[in-house]
């Protein structure tokens, strides 16, 4: 019999990408469905998802395309961008990413698929890299304690304003910003200040703080160093004057300039902020980049964001961990120091490694070359009669050309260079690591000047004041001197990566975190220079490909969520929350309802919800959670009635943080609307809804999404992320905008949330590609398989562990909660013991003690195949059997594989005095010696690290293996 001939059209399609993204194949799905008692995915989700929220129609999205087709489309979009020499400045500069860092960090899934290092024993490589970053920032700024990254320079400055108000002695008065500060930073500060009643005053501080401002009281001062105009001036007198007024002083500093200039700490600053973008991180049309903040020691315990510290493990060996977590949003909620959750870990690692790679001498060489080009450029312009405004500068010139500025900028553009049009009479020109002689000549030609670079190089003097030159050594730690050769650097990066656990090793079943596949085809384009080398303030006609991609992504996200408008500017989920709440606030105020400031939040909500609400000027009122995991309807109704006239918004997560589809969500939304409030649906769990239900259609007025969860941007070990905000039409006028790019948002918007007009635009091609690869039907099936996987795990584990919550049909959504409290009470085995024992079996722990203390929240996602799901279930069942050995007395309660977990290879050497064997410790059932992941340290003493806070690199002898 002749086999059936396959048509060419079918052969051309190949294997659909959907089958690459979704882990379980059709046969595996059938087995899983049988386990949970359903015949098809449609039957399962029909039973799990409440009828009242179901979408009647399929997603109206372009049909799925192959990887080759999508990459070709991306290439076509990239080709529509024009990358000119980026001499605009304003905090964004051309930089050269060392290929060893590009290939082995930015393009390496061992780095970019990891999660925030809440499990420090399996995050030691990443934590060491972040400690390098903190040490680099601390040494260059001259301040002893640096955090592990913030979102960008603008938000770092806004966080500094909040910190100044929180820790300073002056509790009232104004926040004073020098007029020569980056304009986007000023705008972000003003956006952040207004809801909390902080008055921001922008003034020229070149001659000190004006008396009329000093008389009003000043709680904080921000100085740019060097200034946005490029000016380098002595800021120490202003710092001294501010301190006399009791103000906290923040200096927004350029790290490359600080290799040559006196540090902010040496000048007396209390806080330093900025961006590390020019340390090897592509501009990416605005991001992502790692912002930074460093502070005096007395403010360390009030820092926003993550802070890596040095502690010890159970054997007394040096180990790293996240320090002082009790000040963060996931614990302190509305009392947190900040709403920052996702930061910019991957980019911080890159920037820190850039300093490791170049060392102090290499960085100074780059700085001197950049400055030399600026000085040569200035002398050439002066020789042609052009007025260079400032005599002292580092890399940026401002020149006065009355009435000619626009023409000069246009002429430079014709010659392949982008300059900054300051106003009709002034042009600004910034040099950077990538500046070339030909670019200098092109700029001269645009001004009608010419020069001899060799002759000027021999004659030109530095334009940095002698009194402001740095005299102390920088980057003195051995880590910045040991890895000069690429061989050494490559091996260092490999050594650190091998210490960590990321998705390239195995499943990371963190509930509410959606650790799904980050496909290589989705990632590939972000390193293309047509996307990566584009300046965020480049003219719109040079960014047509990027702007088209952004518009299409916003439209497709609106279709997925059921909203009318989407802004992708927020560069983290927390910032999307803030943007959405600001839109709600602005809407109420536009209607004359200024008194509507109460934000109702269920007790089970993400910690960022409450922290963001406080930042948006709202009063948080907590709503109880019922025993079944849903919002307590009676308590909610009572709170609505109690605050009817002041109700601004209800924030709910859907499906709930308890992993269930709440049946009453539409009813809840209706009652809030009847009381005059808005409904904010937190999109953290959108992976359970895509293609099945739309928040904007079942009662939501506003939601943020997490592109680093649902839409495949990798978590990067703690960032980057993107938190777009979607709104219904009545809130659309109040989305974020930007003063330097009018197209970035509505004229009536609330101001910028992020420093860049389109936030972390450089990683948006990832989500664009995911949606394009999957199509509407593929996205729906991904959701259905995610729900199937969670229910499969729940069914397999239910005979061994209590499953805390489920819906009316006995089903969970995309995650399930395993309750360890009865087991812990009966046996003394803690949730920490189980989490650390999972490491011995080769797993990252699920989410611990959220939203309920003493539980594990498991989210497998659609990307894990059946073999991995079964390996996890088998492991949990094996651990349950180990717990029984403790309960029965076979193993001592204080000496067993759980209480001593994790076990390192080093622990196997020497005497073994435990009541269980070495094999039981490190090769429990199902663990292969050939594939074993060995944690580099034993259980870490968190309390020791917080009591003895050390947040920079230990001395060299501490690195001995």
Curated annotation (Swiss-Prot):
Catalytic activities: N(6)-[(R)-lipoyl]-L-lysyl-[glycine-cleavage complex H protein] + glycine + H(+) = N(6)-[(R)-S(8)-aminomethyldihydrolipoyl]-L-lysyl-[glycine-cleavage complex H protein] + CO2
Pfam families per UniProt: GcvP2_C, GDC-P
UniProt KW keywords: Oxidoreductase, Pyridoxal phosphate
EC category name: oxidoreductase
Cofactor(s) annotated in UniProt: pyridoxal 5'-phosphate
Alphabetized InterPro entries for the sequence: GcvP, GDC-P_C, GDC-P_N, GDC_P, PyrdxlP-dep_Trfase, PyrdxlP-dep_Trfase_major, PyrdxlP-dep_Trfase_small
CDD domains: GDC-P
Superkingdom as given in the UniProt entry: Bacteria
EC number in record: 1.4.4.2
Quaternary organization: The glycine cleavage system is composed of four proteins: P, T, L and H.
PANTHER family: GLYCINE DEHYDROGENASE (DECARBOXYLATING), MITOCHONDRIAL, GLYCINE DEHYDROGENASE, DECARBOXYLATING
Known role: The glycine cleavage system catalyzes the degradation of glycine. The P protein binds the alpha-amino group of glycine through its pyridoxal phosphate cofactor; CO(2) is released and the remaining methylamine moiety is then transferred to the lipoamide cofactor of the H protein.
Protein name in UniProt: Glycine dehydrogenase (decarboxylating)
UniProt organism field: Streptomyces griseus subsp. griseus (strain JCM 4626 / CBS 651.72 / NBRC 13350 / KCC S-0626 / ISP 5235)
Name of encoding gene: gcvP
